[in-house]
Amino acid sequence: MTEDDNTRDPVTGEHLKEWGHRPGKQFGELLARANEMRAQGFGLVRIQAELASEIPDLPPVMDPHGPGAVAFHENIEAGDPDELDNIEKVRETMAALMRTPTLEAGAIMPDACPAGPVGTIPVGGVAAARNAIHPGMHSADICCSVMITDLGHADPKAVLDAAQSVTHFGPGGRPQGKRFTTSLKLLDAFRENRFLDNPKSLRMAQEHMGTQGDGNHFLFVGRSRKTGRTAIVTHHGSRGPGALLYKNGMALAERFRRELSPKTLKQNAWIPAESEEGRAYWEALQLIRKWTKANHNVIHQATVEAAGAEVGDRFWNEHNFVFRRGDLYFHGKGATPAWGEYAADASGLTLIPLNMAEPVLVARGKDAAHGLGFSPHGAGRNFSRSEHKRRLGSRTPEAQLKAETAGLDVRFHAGAVDVSELPSSYKQADKVVAQIKAYDLAEIEDYIDPYGCIMAGDLPPFWQTAKRGRR
């Protein structure tokens, strides 16, 4: 008689995990050996004992750093009570963030503002981790980025009209018949990655191509102050595919957190970069970056064709991402990489948009040590969207838009005026520019002065739209 009555039932991966084995390349060999023993009549208790020596030693638990043990650089200053209140909140959350045991350095940019519960990396925040990728520090909008294309002396209105006819704002993707082609090579690469090889990711990679989402994402048309040439600038991220990768990455990081550092804040959980899972996640990030770049490209190219414009230079940069320098992983949450070789396709120039009534800055980073090699990604906020709406009082969104953007062609593609995206909801642009210069974070080489822009607008909650669609 064997040690259990169900000796014909195979040993599965669930058995191995219950016994303490970690999923990985060795799983296949372990399962083969286990089931060979099973076929010989061994019971589960005996098989578990035979394989026990294969269980890797658990790494020691990592406790959070002590308060203030790891400092962070401040590249921001306050000039009024709102700015001071904002900086105090950013300092509080950064102090908690820097207790994460993998972190070795941090910095905040002139556009810094809180982005969640205390301890969450703020917008305009940078965190350098050793051998760790923190999904919560690149956020759900992975690879949120900006791209610019020089359109020569095309008429800005014609370009904005053309762009409005081809872009897509709002939730979800494009319907059949209105989709852009997604690279088959890229889709095949998705299928080879454990984080991206699922029906939902593959479907959204096709449906969301050529879409921009909502919130602060935009399509901007303006003229170069240096050359007088027309340019289009888009701002958006990786849409559904990136959001799903973030969700799966956070779930995996949480499992590691419980094992490696249960006292670390949940939002700061990490995936060990040198683990099999970490290498696969890093590769998934690079594939999402390629998808996001293609997403910008199709909108730009379709606009060029619809406007009949000539094409000059085109470049882009991300500002929600993870960058590797040596042994450290630099997490930028609303922070622009400001060193020349941050990526193989880096041009040396980056874009820093401010608000719909101000120019987009064309900058060359200074790789400042006190910025950990980053510069701002925009203007940032001193108070929340809801507080901004409260301060407007009885003024209508339409009246406020007219007052703040006189002479500009501002359009809301999929909804009413979103007052939380008006210039007054952001920090004063001139102060942000002054601090970029004062802290020597980047050299501003050009200004793309605004003609107009398109944004999603004030949309009803997604669940409300989905509910109406089911009726």
What are these regions (language model features)?
Residues 66-73, 168-195:
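Acidic low-complexity segments
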Residues 91-94, 101-108, 114-123, 131-139, ...:
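Domain-length cofactor-binding catalytic modules of enzymes
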Residues 147:
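Divalent metal-dependent hydrolysis catalytic cores, especially in the metallo-beta-lactamase
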Residues 1-60:
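Charged substrate- and nucleic-acid-binding regions of tRNA-handling and nucleotidyl-transfer enzymes
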Residues 151-153:
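Acidic, low-complexity central loop/insert segments
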Residues 52-82:
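Low-complexity, highly charged intrinsically disordered N-terminal segments
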Residues 83-88, 96:
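Histidine-rich, glycine-flanked metal-binding segment
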